[in-house]
Amino acid sequence: MDFMKPETVLDLGNIRDALVRMEDTIIFNFIERSQFYASPSVYKVNQFPIPNFDGSFLDWLLSQHERIHSQVRRYDAPDEVPFFPNVLEKTFLPKINYPSVLASYADEINVNKEILKIYTSEIVPGIAAGSGEQEDNLGSCAMADIECLQSLSRRIHFGRFVAEAKFISEGDKIVDLIKKRDVEGIEALITNAEVEKRILDRLLEKGRAYGTDPTLKFTQHIQSKVKPEVIVKIYKDFVIPLTKKVEVDYLLRRLEDEEDDDATQKSGGYVDRFLSSGLY
């Protein structure tokens, strides 16, 4: 997928490849995080005295991480959504003028606050090595958290591209649902239970196959792994529902933008095949 070439962004094969790679990244990031205990102090607001900052240790580290990455254009990319947009800085590198693919308000579709809350309260307890503190590894723990959060965010916000493809392909049907503000109807239109089952089945097999990552970055804890059933539950209960929320939120506002002159061209065969696949 090349964001400088809009015709590749909604291509069925490219979409599928991107989603599969994201699954791999998320699973291996979970394996990295599973080396460490839950360490709830990392997520407790003002647990540590950080100068000129009000928030948790993870909030601070993640915001600093995003601030630095913004200087090298990470958040100029259409598929990256920051957790702390207020800390982003201008890049010193030449600006990249990405062609428009999404609606003008796409950057406003941001569920990262929900992702962060669910991650710290629901996901970490399921993948951590234990429920207690691990004071000697707080920094490594938080760094692993950041990789998990950013990979989850990219996967979930990819729903904006899915939604745009469905809007173009469905035409009057989806326009009518948007005009009626029919959230249930839109949800039904974007849901494909058969494809969802295939995703979960694939994740179960990947979880069994991957087991332990032999290239753990922070330590070499050979017992570190995440139960395949936990990975499936995370996708079923959180990743897929949040992706659908992103799609619905995007579609409900889609009529704010006037249709592009090239809408007919963009609704070619590859979008029809994408929709029939039910990928999200």
From Swiss-Prot:
Query: Is Cell wall biogenesis/degradation included in the keywords of this UniProt record?
Result: no
Which segments of the protein form a coiled coil according to its record?
none
GO cellular-component term (any): cytoplasm
Query: What up-regulates or down-regulates this gene?
Result: Induced by growth on methanol carbon source. Slightly induced by growth on the non-fermentable carbon source glycerol. Not induced by histidine starvation.
Q: How does it assemble?
A: Homodimer.
Record EC number = 5.4.99.5
Q: Give the enzyme class.
A: isomerase
Ranges for domain Chorismate mutase come to 3-256
Which protein, by its recorded name, is this?
Chorismate mutase
Residues binding L-tryptophan, per UniProt: 137, 139-140
Q: How does activity depend on temperature?
A: Optimum temperature is 48 degrees Celsius.
What does the protein in this record do? Catalyzes the Claisen rearrangement of chorismate to prephenate. Acts at the first branch point in the aromatic amino acid pathway where it steers biosynthesis towards phenylalanine and tyrosine, and away from tryptophan.
- Pfam families per the record? CM_2
Compartmental location: Cytoplasm
User: Per the UniProt record, which residue ranges are transmembrane?
Assistant: none
What modulates its activity?
A: Each dimer has two allosteric binding sites that can bind the regulatory effectors tryptophan or tyrosine. Can bind either one tryptophan or one tyrosine, two tryptophan or two tyrosine or one tryptophan and one tyrosine, which differentially affect the catalytic activity. Activated by tryptophan and subject to feedback inhibition by tyrosine. In the presence of both tryptophan and tyrosine, the enzyme is in the activated state.
- Higher taxonomy: Eukaryota, Fungi, Dikarya, Ascomycota, Saccharomycotina
Could you tell me the keywords of this UniProt record? Allosteric enzyme, Amino-acid biosynthesis, Aromatic amino acid biosynthesis, Cytoplasm, Isomerase, Phenylalanine biosynthesis, Tyrosine biosynthesis
Q: In which pathway does it act?
A: Metabolic intermediate biosynthesis; prephenate biosynthesis; prephenate from chorismate: step 1/1
Gene Ontology terms: biological process: chorismate metabolic process; L-phenylalanine biosynthetic process; tyrosine biosynthetic process
Entry binding sites for L-tyrosine: 73-74, 137, 139-140
- Molecular function terms in GO for this entry? chorismate mutase activity
Please write the reaction equations for the catalytic activity of this protein: chorismate = prephenate
Q: According to the lineage, what is the superkingdom?
A: Eukaryota
